């Protein structure tokens, strides 16, 4: 494969030559899996997604030009799934299954177009939202985040000359390769790329994926980025996200329905998917409450993805829960994916080795770790904690509690109501860096 001189490309690019989002497949695989279920079961549900910058010290509206942002968002709205992409989605095996996407769904997807957006500025931040049918607005999440993160990177590098850019990328590559060599030393490790949404740039994510493929071989199990999976003959990986229980909870008409929302999601999911796709994401309203009230059949699922508790602490609680239900953790799977750095991966791997099957979804610290790489002192290339969350469903506020209160989203009064219902056990505030 021909290698791209990223530094030269950055120095020479204009947005028209290098649109940030090149394809509707430039998204996370779980968005397509969730989309099929939404399309099939909830086509009449409306949902609003909103940008949330948790790194409030970074004033995005001061760093990113509004005209450039609108150009990139508008360009994304011109994209359609190509014939090649549709053939690949329809004919490829995913998680060992042929035709995981129904022909009727693919026929609908062929005409898909991202809906309109609302953009304004307030107190140095962008207010960006997407409202309409859930089966359309859901696909804005990943491209919106990728666009804003890459525009911020481009703005930071605009003052760099060719030599400074060479130094920047040389240092970043060396930093990334040093991490790769450390991971290679862990026998049986399984690493995947989960870094699309907060990546430095598309070209950089592509380089990181190629580096992992070259550097750790079969230990690199694939990528969540569908376009990169297709282009690099890799497995497309991902299951489901917090938006499903958040929407189901928002639509609940009683406290009983609200408490059952996380499990109704799993029941609906199982109608569409099975096997290795039966991965539980337990922390939308707190892992402790999820495990406390979970029906016994949840223990039959393949595994869990603990996403906001410290990985060792959160993983041990799930192992204990399995044992209490007569399940052997060695036959189960834990997928760790929350803000992982190579040190966290090493520590978690060593702790759980021999106790449970493990996989690591490596995100922002894989695809956007430029701290200390610039030839001049700056923090403008440091990654920030930027999310695009569902904030309303059919006009009702949507809430995420999380195991980490710093990651909670939603209306304050609704958060208080959810806490009364689900409880606050084991919720511990931690610094959210990415």
From Swiss-Prot:
Keyword entries, A-Z: Ligase, Phosphoprotein, Pyridine nucleotide biosynthesis
GO cellular component: a single term: cytosol
Reactions accelerated catalytically: nicotinate + 5-phospho-alpha-D-ribose 1-diphosphate + ATP + H2O = nicotinate beta-D-ribonucleotide + ADP + phosphate + diphosphate
GO biological process: NAD biosynthetic process via the salvage pathway
Alphabetical list of Pfam families matching this protein: NAPRTase (PF04095), NAPRTase_N (PF17767)
Family note: Belongs to the NAPRTase family.
HAMAP family to which the protein is assigned, alphabetical: NAPRTase
NCBIfam families to which the protein is assigned, alphabetical: NAPRTase (TIGR01514), PRK05321.1 (NF003704)
Name of the molecule in the record: Nicotinate phosphoribosyltransferase
Species the sequence originates in: Mesorhizobium japonicum (strain LMG 29417 / CECT 9101 / MAFF 303099)
Source taxonomy: Bacteria, Pseudomonadati, Pseudomonadota, Alphaproteobacteria, Hyphomicrobiales
Gene, per the UniProt record: pncB
């Amino acid at each position: 494969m021909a290698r791209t001189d990223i530094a030269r490309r950055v120095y020479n690019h204009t947005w028209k030559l290098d649109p940030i989002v090149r394809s509707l497949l430039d998204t996370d695989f779980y968005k397509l899996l969730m989309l099929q279920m939404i399309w099939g079961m909830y086509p009449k549900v409306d949902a609003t997604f909103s940008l949330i910058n948790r790194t409030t010290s970074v004033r995005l509206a001061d760093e990113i030009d509004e005209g450039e942002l609108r150009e990139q968002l508008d360009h994304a709205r011109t994209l359609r799934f190509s014939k090649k992409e549709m053939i690949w989605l329809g004919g490829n095996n995913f998680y060992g299954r042929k035709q995981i996407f129904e022909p009727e769904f693919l026929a609908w997807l062929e005409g898909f177009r991202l809906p309109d957006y609302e953009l304004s500025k307030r107190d140095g931040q962008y207010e960006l939202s997407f409202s309409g049918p859930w089966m359309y607005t859901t696909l804005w999440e990943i491209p919106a985040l990728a666009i804003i993160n890459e525009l911020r990177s481009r703005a930071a590098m605009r003052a760099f000359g060719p030599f400074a850019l060479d130094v920047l990328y040389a240092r970043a590559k060396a930093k990334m390769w040093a991490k790769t060599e450390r991971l290679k030393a862990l026998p049986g490790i399984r690493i995947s790329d989960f870094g699309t949404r907060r990546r430095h740039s598309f070209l950089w994510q592509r380089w990181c994926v190629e580096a992992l493929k070259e550097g750790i071989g079969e230990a690199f199990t694939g990528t969540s980025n569908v376009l990169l999976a297709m282009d690099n003959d890799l497995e497309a990986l991902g299951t489901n996200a917090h938006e499903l229980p958040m929407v189901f909870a928002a639509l609940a008409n009683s406290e009983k329905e609200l408490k059952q929302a996380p499990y109704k999601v799993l029941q609906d999911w199982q109608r569409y998917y099975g096997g290795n796709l039966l991965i539980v994401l337990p922390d939308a309203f707190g892992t402790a409450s999820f495990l406390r009230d979970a029906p016994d059949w949840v223990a039959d699922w393949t595994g869990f993805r603990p996403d906001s508790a410290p990985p060792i602490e959160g993983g041990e609680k799930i192992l204990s829960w399995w044992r209490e239900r007569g399940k052997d953790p060695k036959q189960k799977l834990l997928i760790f994916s929350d803000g992982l750095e190579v040190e966290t991966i090493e520590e978690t791997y060593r702790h759980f080795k021999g106790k449970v099957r493990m996989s690591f979804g490596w995100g922002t610290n894989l695809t956007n770790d430029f701290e200390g790489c610039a030839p001049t002192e700056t923090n403008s290339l440091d990654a920030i904690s930027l999310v695009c969350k569902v904030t309303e469903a059919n006009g009702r506020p949507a809430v995420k509690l999380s195991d980490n209160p710093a990651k909670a989203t939603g209306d304050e009064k609704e958060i208080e109501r959810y806490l009364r219902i689900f409880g606050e056990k084991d919720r511990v505030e931690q610094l959210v860096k990415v």
